[in-house]
Amino acid sequence: MKVLVFAIVCSVLLQVVLSADEEARECIPTKHDCTNDRKNCCPGHECKCYNTQIGGSKKEQCGCKKSLLAKAKNFGGKVITIFKA
């Protein structure tokens, strides 16, 4: 009986871990809203937020943007490609 309960608990925990892992893989692409999920932007991107005033009420709007490090890597790669040609 204890073995059966242990097996069921392990099965449930495994399903929870796998479903959490699948959710983590679905990242938010560039220029999409990340207001409610700020830590799930795709690698090389970060959630940047701006305070806007629409119709007299202040609202925070966030979007996934390329990080400064990702921009520098992209620019460096282009410069190296130019000099190799």
From Swiss-Prot:
One of its GO terms (molecular function) is toxin activity. The keyword Secreted applies. It is found in: Secreted. Disulfide bonds join C27-C42, C34-C47, C41-C64, C49-C62. Residues 1-19 form the signal peptide. A motif (Processing quadruplet motif) lies at residues 22-25. Pfam families: Toxin_35. Expressed by the venom gland. The keyword Mitochondrion does not apply. GO terms for cellular component: extracellular region. Keywords: Disulfide bond, Knottin, Neurotoxin, Secreted, Signal, Toxin. InterPro entries: Spider_toxin_CSTX_knottin (IPR019553). Residues 20-25 form a propeptide. Contains 4 disulfide bonds. Cleavage of the propeptide depends on the processing quadruplet motif (XXXR, with at least one of X being E). Its main location: secreted. Belongs to the neurotoxin 19 (CSTX) family. Insect toxin. Causes paralysis in larvae of C.vicina by depolarizing membranes at the neuromuscular junction. The C-terminal part (65-85) forms an alpha-helix which probably disrupts target membranes. The presence of a 'disulfide through disulfide knot' structurally defines this protein as a knottin. This is Latartoxin-1a. It comes from Lachesana tarabaevi (Spider).
